[in-house]
Design a protein with these regions (language model features):
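Conserved phosphate-binding/catalytic region of the ribokinase-like
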Residues: 161-210
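Conserved N-terminal subdomain of the carbohydrate kinase-like
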Residues: 8-90, 107, 111-115
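Short, hinge-like loop/turn segments at secondary-structure boundaries
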Residues: 27-30, 52-56, 135-137, 160-163, ...
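Beta-barrel outer-membrane channel/assembly domains of diderm bacteria
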Residues: 1-5
Length: 210
């Protein structure tokens, strides 16, 4: 999406030295997407999808895979030194190897005006901890979170108040954020900056019955 707006961007991750890994690299090259994807001695990441008796899907994110083990290479260090905006999540930090790489990348980025370190929380299964979340809050200056994740975070950190906006103001101030983006599904989205909040309704889009 960023590259489609004309910006010089990279996808950073890791794949295995296997058929799935080769397929991913081939697709990225065919689409001419710039990437920094290392091949490592772990299987390419997969998600196992099963359906319950009512047809509701259940997702199992496999562990011990390539993207759990993204190395911090010299090439990645050079990329960090020239990066002005980065987006990272919590799921990719479930393993200490990729977590250390993400943190080193963030710490290596130059401290310049307009720099963006966007933490897009993605709480999946039990792949998150208070420690990892707290570190990420301190390292980011923009936080993107949905309403369900905000409830979970508030419970974990003991933030008071019932109103979701109150909790957003607490996070914005506590971690000195430039911006907090709260998405609420069909109920719209909010953008918080120091002293200002704006709201955007969710567009009404006709969805075909499949």
């Amino acid at each position: 999406h960023v590259s489609q707006f004309g910006f010089d961007s990279r996808v950073v991750s890791a794949v295995g030295r296997d058929e799935l890994g080769e397929e991913i690299l081939k697709v990225f090259n065919e689409k001419k997407l710039k990437m920094q994807i290392e091949q490592v001695d772990y299987p390419t990441g997969t998600v196992q999808v099963t359906l319950d008796d009512e047809g509701v899907p259940c997702y199992e994110i496999k562990e011990g895979v390539a993207w759990d083990n993204i190395p911090f290479t010299d090439e990645l260090k050079r990329l960090a030194l020239s990066t002005r905006a980065v987006c990272f999540g919590s799921l990719a930090q479930r393993n200490e190897v990729s977590r250390a790489t993400i943190n080193r990348f963030l710490d290596t980025m130059p401290d310049i005006d307009g720099q963006l370190k966007i933490f897009d929380i993605n709480l999946r299964q039990d792949f998150y901890s208070k420690e990892v979340l707290r570190e990420s809050f301190h390292r980011c200056n923009v936080l993107k979170i949905n309403d369900e994740e905000l409830v979970t975070i508030s419970r974990m950190f003991g933030y008071p108040g019932i109103d979701l906006q109150d909790k957003c103001w607490i996070l914005l101030a506590k971690y000195n954020l430039k911006m907090l983006i709260l998405t609420c599904g069909i109920n719209g989205s909010y953008v918080f900056t120091p002293g200002v909040v704006s709201f955007q309704e969710t567009p009404k889009v006709p969805v075909p019955d499949t």
